[in-house]
Amino acid sequence: MRTALLSLLVMLSAVAALTSCVDDEEYANTPRGNFEALWRIIDEHYCFFDYKQKEYGLDWDEVRLRYVSRIDDTMNDDQLFEVLGAMLGELRDGHVNMYSSWDVARNWSWHEDYPSNISDSLIRRYLGTDYRIAASLCYRILDDNVGYVRCASFASEAGEGNLDEVMYYLAACRGLIIDVRDNGGGLITAAEKMAARFTNKRVLVGYMQHKTGRGRNDFSSMEPQYLNPSTGMRWQKRVVVLTNRSVYSAANEFVKYMKCCPQVTVVGDRTGGGAGMPFSSELPVGWSIRFSACPMYDADKQPTEFGIEPDHNVAMGKDDLQRGTDSIIEYARQLLGQ
């Protein structure tokens, strides 16, 4: 894990060096100046132009021509924010945001346009009232001796001691369900630390690149990502990971790692994606900009920006709430019972 973290830090340092160059360009704090600053920041540092051109025909030059006609130096900040936010929406990227004091421009279509495939009330029913909590993990043993771990976020890291306790408590179970549905991400190191409990050897899990220049295709060669086994207690039985469209960013990476581990099956819906390491800059008006700067790929060098397919595509049923059962959890239990 230290090797992957070192590579990540080196790449982020390179991105920081490049992004600082944005400040070398002086733009007036006018609607036109802010438009030009934003378009150029994205043009020189965003990492998915080629991929998204192939996926849905994104043409950043055409986007500029279309939106510059909407810029008028008499427009107010609300109007400018709306136009610039709409332009950023053309990237279809949940890691691309613009922050003002009154709003956040965002694109959440990666999960808003799809069924949620999760119910908080049903998850509470499976957890009951006597479940255990270790850092951000909620866990218990279900009636059929299957371990259930609810991991709703990687915003903070579970310590090695926390993970040891979870592994020890569930050790007698015949299988394990890890539910990361609606996990919007957080720390990649937290995702790595958890995934490291499910492999006994160093395994290639993917690749990363960083920008080496201002050209849209100025990238380093692909640098491998490896997952090293934890020195703590490791799980040796079958595992099912549950996913939906709201699995994003570091959680998307977790699913990527787990698909490379033995005895792991992914069940649910395609993940939301978010495979660009985000970085930040600022416009003359003072609004912060976040964007994807370092692309990440799976072990086959394929992009996961628009998500990872499950091994078994399962949706929640329309009558799940009425029956009090979660079709995705129940499918996982059946797999572990085979």
Which role does the model predict for each range below?
Residues 257, 329-331:
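Solvent-exposed alpha-helical segments and adjacent loops
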Residues 189-323:
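Conserved acidic, small-residue-rich alpha-beta core segments centered on
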Residues 331-338:
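C-terminal alpha-helix
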Residues 13, 168, 231-234:
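Structural motif
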Residues 20-210, 217-224, 238, 280, ...:
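Flexible, low-complexity junctional segments that flank or bridge functional domains
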Residues 1-28:
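Bacterial Sec-dependent N-terminal signal peptides
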